[in-house]
Each structure stands twice: as structure tokens, then as C-alpha cells.
Design a protein with these regions (language model features):
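A short beta-loop-beta micro-motif enriched in histidine and acidic residues
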Residues: 53, 65-78
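Extracellular/periplasmic catalytic domains that process cell-envelope and extracellular macromolecules
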Residues: 50-52, 72, 97, 118-123
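Ligand-binding loop in jelly-roll beta-barrel domains
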Residues: 95, 109-136
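A short, N-terminal "cap"/entry segment at the start of jelly-roll beta-barrel domains
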Residues: 2-10, 16-56, 89, 105, ...
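Short acidic-glycine-tyrosine-enriched beta hairpin
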Residues: 52, 62-63, 92-109
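Histidine-centered metal-chelating micro-motifs
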Residues: 67-69, 87, 104, 108-117
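Glycine- and acidic-residue-biased ligand/ion/polar-headgroup-sensing regions
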Residues: 73-92, 100-102
């Protein structure tokens, strides 16, 4: 992986990790240790056939009861659940609970209203695969 791609991957993951940490703490300020999510970067890769776009792949782990605040990615985001149970919802759609092997999609205009571990006792882990504009943040708060 070249230095530019590595820097982009680390920057995207750092922004997402900071956002997950602060958003999760806000969900239950009395128990910040209970709600933290962590993001682990796996890959950032330019898409030469789609100028100006890149793929970002990472894993997100929620501790039991963990959640994030409403947000958007301005990207096509595909989620694949590895373990545990995850509650997902975008505006205009009913919430869904996903288990291992199940998938979820967020479109570029979607506000991701709910992203949470559906269990109060077990962690949840999922892979995030996003196609996004280069040099733009991976995640931002919902308007």
C-alpha cells in the first residue's frame, strides 16, 4: 500500500473512531465505557475506473449496548455483520435487526438514524465497505 493510500485509510478510520467514541458516549454519559465503538481500518483503495472515488473497508465493533448518533456518509455503504446482532435504520425505512451473514445498504443521501448493538450482553462486529469521494470525510453528523 502506498503512503498516500495508507494516510487516507488512517485518516478515515481516525475520523470514524473519534465520531464513534464521542457519539457512543453521548448515548449514555453515565456509562461511557459501556457504549464505545471501535473502528479498525482494513483498506483504502483508489478506483482508477471511477475517477475521484475510493473504496474504504473497515470493521466496527460495538460493545454490549453500544450505539452511535445519527449520521451520514455521503457514500454508498455496505455492511456485513460478522458477529452479534446489530440494529440499523435509515430515514424513511423501518428498523432492521441483522445477525451474522446479513447485509445492509446506506445510499449517499441517507441519514443513518440508528446504528446500535441490539444486545446488552454480547458485542457486535461488522465490516463496512464504502465507495466514497476521495479527500472527503468518511462520516459526518446528520444535519
Amino acid at each position: 500500500m502506498n503512503t498516500r493510500n495508507r494516510l487516507a485509510m488512517l485518516t478515515s478510520a481516525a475520523l470514524l473512531a473519534c465520531w464513534l467514541s464521542s457519539a457512543s458516549t453521548a448515548a449514555d454519559p453515565a456509562r461511557p465505557e459501556k457504549n464505545r465503538g471501535t473502528a479498525q481500518p482494513l483498506l483504502t483503495q483508489d478506483l482508477p475506473d471511477i475517477p475521484g472515488k475510493e473504496v474504504v473497508v473497515l470493521t466496527v465493533t460495538y460493545l454490549p449496548g453500544g450505539a452511535s448518533l445519527p449520521h451520514r456518509h455521503d457514500a454508498d455503504v455496505f455492511v456485513y455483520v460478522l458477529e452479534g446482532s446489530v440494529l440499523m435504520q435509515v430515514d424513511g425505512q423501518p428498523p432492521v435487526t441483522l445477525g451474522p451473514g446479513q447485509t445492509f445498504h446506506e445510499g449517499p443521501g441517507d441519514i443513518h438514524r440508528q446504528s446500535a448493538n441490539a444486545s446488552a450482553t454480547q458485542p457486535a462486529k461488522f465490516v463496512v465497505f464504502m465507495i466514497k469521494d476521495k479527500n472527503k470525510p468518511a462520516t459526518r453528523a446528520a444535519d
